[in-house]
Regions:
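Short beta-turn/strand-loop junction motif enriched in small, turn-promoting residues
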Residues: 23-25, 75, 154
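Conserved beta-strand hairpin/beta-sheet module of binuclear metal-dependent hydrolase folds
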Residues: 7-61, 168-184
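Short, hydrophobic/aromatic-rich segments at coil-to-beta transitions
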Residues: 14-19, 144, 153-155
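Short, basic/low-complexity N-terminal boundary segments at the transition from targeting/disordered tails
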Residues: 1, 11-15, 119-127
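Short Gly/Pro-enriched turn/cap motifs at secondary-structure boundaries
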Residues: 8, 25-26, 131, 136-138, ...
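A short catalytic or substrate-binding loop motif that flags glycine-/basic-rich loops and adjacent residues
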Residues: 2, 27-29, 160-162
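Metallo-beta-lactamase
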Residues: 42-45, 50-51, 139, 146, ...
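Active-site HxH/HxHxD metal-binding segment of metal-dependent hydrolases
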Residues: 50-148
Length: 200
């Protein structure tokens, strides 16, 4: 099952699990993905990507259940779309980074989107569709916390490494681990800090 709009494409990879991408990105540009995990009483949007387009409205085409915005970490390619949601859940180590971010205005974000887009898609991009930083509630999550979606429970695992507060979500129902940038071969950006802590 595939669901699309002007900005997003969702592919159902397992029952109730949708991988969300933005297929209009030019080859060679930085990509980011999010996952919508739909239970029987709530859903989780795991990472909000770049903020190009209204991710919340897109998710509401897939489910009418309450959607919890959960971040793997604070970097702008994973959390810039948070501000279209009522609140987000993020590890406290990464909470200060939410507003440091990717872009501060819709115009700045539009310029980034244009720089990323395939030429034939540039005319579709509009400033009013960009998600910009504004006040929102952010709730801390910790290692071992559990999100109960009804037919499945997702457990928070604090892993650090890529950022101080990087987390994974474990879904034992489908034997899936959602990892953000934690399981990557070239993006462990805080390794030096970690070594200093271990040596102290």
């Amino acid at each position: 099952r595939v669901i699309e709009d002007d900005y997003f494409r969702a592919t159902e990879t397992f029952p109730g699990i949708y991988k969300i991408s933005q297929p209009w990105f030019r080859e060679g540009t930085l990509l980011s993905f999010g996952f919508l995990i739909v239970g029987t009483k709530a859903a989780i949007m795991y990472d909000s990507m770049f903020g190009y387009g209204n991710l919340r409205k897109f998710c509401e085409k897939i489910t009418d259940l309450p959607i919890l915005m959960v971040n793997s970490h604070f970097h702008g390619d994973h959390a810039a779309g948070n501000f279209d949601f009522d609140c987000c859940y993020i590890h406290p180590f990464d909470l200060p980074g939410i507003y440091k971010g990717f872009a501060q205005t819709q115009e700045e974000l539009l310029a980034r989107a244009i720089d990323t887009a395939k030429p034939e898609f540039v005319s579709h991009l509009k400033a009013e569709d960009m998600c910009y930083p504004r006040p929102m509630k952010a709730f801390p999550i910790f290692d071992g916390d559990v999100f109960d979606l009804g037919d499945r429970e997702l457990t928070v695992v604090h892993v650090g490494g890529h950022s101080p507060g990087s987390i994974m979500l474990l879904d034992p129902t489908y034997h899936v681990a959602y990892s953000g940038d934690t399981c990557n071969n070239d993006t462990i950006v805080t390794w030096a800090d970690s070594i200093e802590e271990y040596l102290a």
